Design a protein with these regions (language model features):
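Globular "head" domains of long coiled-coil molecular machines
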Residues: 1-197
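Mixed-charge, glycine-rich, non-catalytic linkers/tails in nucleic-acid processing enzymes
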Residues: 200-204
């Protein structure tokens, strides 16, 4: 928005029991045209116990993603990596070469294993060896929560709603949420927080 140029950070609190003592940071990412943002990302990574890496399903785990993990994440002492594959609907609904969720996931797992074989960092290889990528659609999840009146009044939202309904045979917001697979991602985050926090901290 209009305040991006003067905003250093935004803090949001969410009173959920399993998030007690947990801080989630949405970093600017890498390859940002503003160098200072990339430097801030590296600083945050040095303090992080877990990295949530969100890939784009249109080109999952490409050379850029590989560089992020093997050139940046490996230097920061990360205890765990959680991989999401956003916009899984793009290859899923491809007219020329459609792929289901399992095919998308297996492709990313194969690429990660291939990259691991080329890496000499045993610690990072161990961290990535049990990664289970999770396909999801953040836009479908958002559409499942927005008021239908808002969706109907927006040309962009209405177009997206109709496209998903047509491609997935969806007729309600409950079905839209189910097909978003956001629950799978939330469950993975929750499991990591509740079951592996001590193990991650001990490993570091």
């Amino acid at each position: 928005g209009k305040f991006v140029s003067i905003t250093k950070s935004v803090t949001i609190y969410y009173p959920h029991e399993y998030l007690k003592g947990v801080e989630v940071v949405d970093t600017p990412g890498f390859n940002d045209p503003i160098v200072s943002r990339e430097e801030r990302t590296k600083e945050f990574l040095k303090k992080a116990d877990v990295v949530i890496m969100m890939l784009y399903a249109g080109r999952p785990f490409d050379a850029t993603d590989r560089d992020i993990i093997f050139k940046n994440v490996r230097q920061c002492g990360i205890g765990k990596v959680l991989v999401g594959i956003n916009k899984y609907d793009i290859p899923y609904c491809s007219e020329t070469n459609p792929e289901d969720e399992n095919q998308i996931k297996e492709y990313v797992k194969t690429e990660i294993k291939k990259a691991c074989r080329e890496c000499n960092d045993n610690t990072l290889v161990e961290i990535l060896s049990d990664v289970e990528p999770i396909p999801l659609s953040a836009e479908m999840a958002l559409l499942s929560e927005l008021p239908m009146s808002k969706i109907s009044s927006s040309e962009a939202w209405n177009f997206a709603w109709k496209r998903y309904c047509s491609n997935f045979g969806i007729s309600s917001q409950a079905e839209m949420y189910k097909w978003s697979h956001l629950d799978n991602f939330v469950s993975a985050v929750k499991s990591m927080v509740e079951n592996e926090k001590n193990k991650i901290l001990f490993a570091k």
